Regions:
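Two-metal-ion RNase H-like nuclease active-site motif
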Residues: 1
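Single, function-defining residue in the core of a domain
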Residues: 4, 8-276
Length: 276
């Protein structure tokens, strides 16, 4: 089902994709598709799921570079998804942008489309490089700096992918059949969300009980919670533990906390590998 990156190297690969609530730390929808499947197709599946759940209104979907296309943007406009998309610098609408502009995507009589408005924003990063964002948010009170900050809200999804790969080892499948692979993929998504639920509750309790005289702020240790959840949940499902084990984990997590280090930044490492 999933396909091979190289016929001479017989290991299977697939495309995992998620739509992630960056404020509440939950994976809203996840999909696992064959190797070299379209990321835009995966994104459309996520949008369809948000529509089915009726949870897309008053939410802004933030897309990384590579997801933008005129068809994708038109879909968001027609289905009333608020969106913010990073543009590649070689797109014409990006080349024509200086500052903050509203322009028109012209109709196509052959496709039966109409003119639609699109707002393009130029943002300058700390290192002086320019990025370009496209949106259907036309409120003039939302400034370029606000859009810059809004786009950076998507960064937690990168750490969520890292969590799935490193802490939950979502790429290390023990099964060989399609059904078992999908089961392992989605159980790891479930474990991630369960860990987030526990962490959110613990963080709330830590904030309530924190003293104003404390020099540092603390939060629950995510790695500790994930490690314990991976051990506890299978035993609960096998009736070796009862649900009270999660209450015990909650109390343990209140004691095992980590210091919040605000303002930390890390230089992003560029992948120097040459693609096939």
């Amino acid at each position: 089902m999933f396909g091979y990156p190289d016929p001479s190297r017989r290991f299977t690969m697939g495309l995992g994709s998620i739509v992630y609530d960056v404020l509440d730390d939950y994976i809203v929808h996840a999909s696992f598709q064959r190797y070299l499947a379209s990321e835009r197709s995966a994104a459309l599946e996520h949008l369809h799921n948000l529509e089915d759940l009726n949870i897309y209104q008053n939410s802004v979907v933030i897309f990384d570079r590579g997801y933008y296309s005129e068809d994708m943007f038109r879909y968001c406009v027609e289905r009333q998804h608020l969106c913010l998309m990073r543009l590649k610098q070689n797109y014409n609408i990006a080349k024509k942008c200086s500052g903050d502009i509203i322009t028109i995507l012209p109709y196509n009589e052959k496709d039966g489309t109409e003119d639609i408005r699109i707002r393009v924003i130029e943002v300058i990063l700390n290192d002086g490089t320019n990025e370009y964002l496209a949106t259907n948010l036309f409120d003039s009170h939302i400034s370029q700096q606000m859009f810059r900050e809004l786009y950076f809200y998507r960064w937690p999804v990168e750490t969520k992918y890292k969590e799935l790969k490193s802490c939950l080892a979502i790429e290390e499948f023990s099964g060989a059949k399609t059904t078992s692979v999908l089961q392992e993929f989605y159980i790891n998504v479930l474990l991630s969300n369960l860990s987030s639920l526990i962490k959110n509750q613990v963080d709330e309790e830590i904030q309530i009980t924190a003293k104003s005289t404390n020099k540092y702020r603390y939060q629950a240790n995510r790695a500790f919670i994930i490690g314990r959840v991976k051990t506890i949940v299978p035993k609960i499902l096998c009736n070796l533990f009862d649900l009270s084990a999660l209450d015990i984990l909650y109390k343990e997590s209140l004691r095992c906390r980590s210091q919040i280090m605000p303002g930390r930044t890390f230089r992003r490492k560029k992948n120097k590998a040459i693609g096939r």
